[in-house]
Amino acid sequence: MKLQPLADRILVKRLAEETKTKGGIIIPDTAKEKPAEGEIVAVGPGRNAEDGTKIALEVKVGDRVLFGKYSGTEVKIEGEEYLIMREDDVLGIVQ
Amino acid sequence: MKLQPLADRILVKRLAEETKTKGGIIIPDTAKEKPAEGEIVAVGPGRNAEDGTKIALEVKVGDRVLFGKYSGTEVKIEGEEYLIMREDDVLGIVQ
Amino acid sequence: MKLQPLADRILVKRLAEETKTKGGIIIPDTAKEKPAEGEIVAVGPGRNAEDGTKIALEVKVGDRVLFGKYSGTEVKIEGEEYLIMREDDVLGIVQ
Amino acid sequence: MKLQPLADRILVKRLAEETKTKGGIIIPDTAKEKPAEGEIVAVGPGRNAEDGTKIALEVKVGDRVLFGKYSGTEVKIEGEEYLIMREDDVLGIVQ
Amino acid sequence: MKLQPLADRILVKRLAEETKTKGGIIIPDTAKEKPAEGEIVAVGPGRNAEDGTKIALEVKVGDRVLFGKYSGTEVKIEGEEYLIMREDDVLGIVQ
Amino acid sequence: MKLQPLADRILVKRLAEETKTKGGIIIPDTAKEKPAEGEIVAVGPGRNAEDGTKIALEVKVGDRVLFGKYSGTEVKIEGEEYLIMREDDVLGIVQ
Amino acid sequence: MKLQPLADRILVKRLAEETKTKGGIIIPDTAKEKPAEGEIVAVGPGRNAEDGTKIALEVKVGDRVLFGKYSGTEVKIEGEEYLIMREDDVLGIVQ
């Protein structure tokens, strides 16, 4: 069982933000909004352009991404917590 | 008797949100807005693009979908409660 | 004598909302905004697309439609009350 | 001497709203915004589309129209009061 | 020496608004925003459409125009006061 | 050393606004926002249209321009103060 | 390890703003929002136009840029602080 996001939405598994992540990104502890890190587990088919064509996403399943701390909507699937957000909420891909 | 939604609207039968649903999705009990689950019972013919063509919906009758808890407008048809919402209010399809 | 709506506007005769309507739709009595039911008595020629072409309406004279309770502007024609609204205010067609 | 409206604007002579008009439209006396009735005395050449072409108006000089009570800007020409408004402020044509 | 307006801007010499103007327009003294009258002394080359082409102005130097009382920005050139405004602020041309 | 503005931005050297400028423009002393005068010292390559083409600027280096008093962002280059603003902030070219 | 920005975003290493920078730009100490200076260390593939094509960025890795003081989102990569922002936040390139 899985969840298929619509349009330009993606399903993200948030990574623990208390520790230094595998990717080596350390989230600074300041007053500004801080980005969070996660792994993409499902992607939508893409955004609909005005002329009806699909614009494919730049991100893909397996990408580790940074996104705004308060981006997306939380959902639990088979006991695991995920986030559904739009691709535009993704700041960058960790490589 | 039924209700035919216009444009990119869909008619959704909300599923009980107190229990673990058949699809296995458990809605987490947090302060953030939580998505609800439902089954699509009717879909509109699609959104009108700027050039007048129809952009068909991605969802179809029978799809089980997640949507924002406060999305849509309530309506009763022959004693049953439904929600009319836009396809864009749908976060993803449960598979 | 009649009133010809402009562009994507329609003229609607509101149906009594206190009782169960002929179409079998019962409006639930909740705190949320509730849709109202009416019959279309006149339609405009359609919305102007950016390139100047007309986009014809999906609804037609005689359709029974649901719309937001506070949609439209009231007007009296020969003693009868009507509502002028945009097609986008219509949630669905009762069939 | 006259006033030539620009783009999609029209010049309207408001009709007395206290009495039942010639067209038979009676404005209901409720708390909602009520439309007013007038006759078009001049029309602009049309709105400019994004590609520079003109989109001709649907209304023409002589049409009796309904419009929002607070639509338009008042102006006096040779002692007579008129309203300048956009065609989109017109709700419908009285026939 | 003169001022060349950019894009769809025009330079207007405001006419005295206390007296009945040559054009015969009398500004009514009500609480609503009242239009003012002026003569166009310079026009821009036109607005840039999305595809980069110019959309020429409808008004030209010498036109007497009505515009919203608070439209535009005041500027003095060689001791004379003018207004710089966008063509869209013009309500109509006095003929 | 210089600063190359991006897109439709320009770099402007503000002229003293206390005295009558060379161009003969006297800024009136009223409560309304008053335009300021400056000389363009650098221009960007132009705005990106929706289809990816560049829309060249109407102004060029050396033009004396009027702009809104609070337009732009201040920056110091080698001890001299400049303003970076968008071309749309320019009201007109002094000739 | 690095961070690949999405779409029209860029990754910027902020330069110390207390001293006169190498590029010779001195940030004035006024009440207005002051621009900051930085060096671009990574750029996204470009913004998606409405028709699905990419619009390449004007800036490139190595460019020294000015940007609004509060632009972008802070992130730490391997102990170093960076800013992720959109290209539109860049005011100009220091040359």
Curated annotation (Swiss-Prot), chains A, B, C, D, E, F, G:
GO process terms (BP): chaperone cofactor-dependent protein refolding
Record's subcellular location: Cytoplasm
GO molecular function, one term: ATP binding
InterPro entries attached to this UniProt entry: Chaperonin_GroES, Chaperonin_GroES_sf, Chaprnonin_Cpn10_CS, GroES-like_sf
Keyword hit for Cell membrane: no
Main location class: cytoplasm
UniProt xrefs under CDD domains: cpn10 (cd00320)
The keyword Chaperone is assigned to this record: yes
Recorded GO CC terms: cytoplasm
Origin: domain of life: Bacteria
Keyword tags: Chaperone, Cytoplasm
Assembly with partners or alone: Heptamer of 7 subunits arranged in a ring. Interacts with the chaperonin GroEL.
Function: Together with the chaperonin GroEL, plays an essential role in assisting protein folding. The GroEL-GroES system forms a nano-cage that allows encapsulation of the non-native substrate proteins and provides a physical environment optimized to promote and accelerate protein folding. GroES binds to the apical surface of the GroEL ring, thereby capping the opening of the GroEL channel.
Protein family (similarity comment): Belongs to the GroES chaperonin family.
Full protein name: Co-chaperonin GroES
Gene giving rise to this polypeptide: groES
